[in-house]
């Protein structure tokens, strides 16, 4: 008899309003899906929508709802991997057709529009950054004042425990 898997819902954790949320659990129950939607893409789009309604779009506003997608190893932040990570986000629906995918250029995440007819992608709004913990020295001294959240994905690895440094 197969046990029914309950899809993960981040709403109860969000209600706690904690500065740091550590989420771990069984594989394939929707943790990443919930986090990338509710803590990465949606907050940016909701703020943008509020700014447009208040006629504050343009250089007169600062969008601080951007995020950093953090992984342990630089191999985990290739453009292909990151774009595949966001492939299940229905960007077209969320942006009312303005964009249809999320792309990476120089480790910056963008809402983008892919044109099937031409095979070309046009970058739009910058929504975040992607970084690897193993290359943190490259980011020291950088300014990320527009970042509100850091999403550290897959922080627990099977078999590759980081040994204690002494």
Feature roles, as predicted:
Residues 1-166:
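Phosphate/NTP-binding elements of NTP-utilizing enzymes
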């Amino acid at each position: 008899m197969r046990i029914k898997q309950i899809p993960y819902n981040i709403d109860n954790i969000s209600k706690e309003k904690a500065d740091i949320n550590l989420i771990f659990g069984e594989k394939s129950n929707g943790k990443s899906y919930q986090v990338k939607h509710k803590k990465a893409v949606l907050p940016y789009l909701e703020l943008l929508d509020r700014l447009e309604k208040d006629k504050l779009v343009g250089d007169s506003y600062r969008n601080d709802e951007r995020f950093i997608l953090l992984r342990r190893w630089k191999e985990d932040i290739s453009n292909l991997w990151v774009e595949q990570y966001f492939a299940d986000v229905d960007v077209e629906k969320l942006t009312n057709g303005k964009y249809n995918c999320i792309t990476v250029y120089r480790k910056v995440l963008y809402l983008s529009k892919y044109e099937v007819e031409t095979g070309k992608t046009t970058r739009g709004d910058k929504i975040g950054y992607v970084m690897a913990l193993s290359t943190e020295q490259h980011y020291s001294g950088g300014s990320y004042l527009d970042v509100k959240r850091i999403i550290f994905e897959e922080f627990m690895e099977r078999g590759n425990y980081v040994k204690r440094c002494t």
